[in-house]
Amino acid sequence: MDELKHQVMINQFVLTAGCAADQAKQLLQAAHWQFETALSAFFQETNIPYGHHHQMMCTPANTPATPPNFPDALTMFSRLKASESFNSSSSPSMATSPPPPPVSWGMAPPMANQQSLWTQGPSAQQTHPPPGWPSAVNQQAASEQKASAAMEAER
């Protein structure tokens, strides 16, 4: 049972610390299988051997978070101008936006016989809720219908 427990701890340590399984086993054994103690020892720089320390100091390559050579990137950005176009034709730049389309919705009131798409007209609504509902619900529904009819009349 202890062997299974140790294997689970090693796997958990590998997932947490991102180290190799043999290194995790060594650290856990040195910490008498105390997970937090071994994890603290792993993340302290004094416990990293010199050979591994050099690898940690190198800049990673080919990772999504690694930018290109920074001075070269700055030089490339400094050469860009806001008015430059990526193609050589005399067409306007992609940075300029076309004129907005004319807005037609919301400008004119709806016609008298036209119902709103979002609300149903008074004729389409139920006049009374189902008979099993409490009277308070029936009164609220009636007042909401009156308010809806009043709002439709104002339009």
From Swiss-Prot:
Residues 81-155 are annotated as: Disordered. Residues 83-96, 139-155 have a biased composition (Low complexity). CDD domains: UBA_F100B_like (cd14343). It comes from the Eukaryota. Residues 112-127 have a biased composition (Polar residues). It holds the Pfam family UBA_8. Coiled coil: none annotated. Belongs to the UBALD family. This is UBA-like domain-containing protein 1.
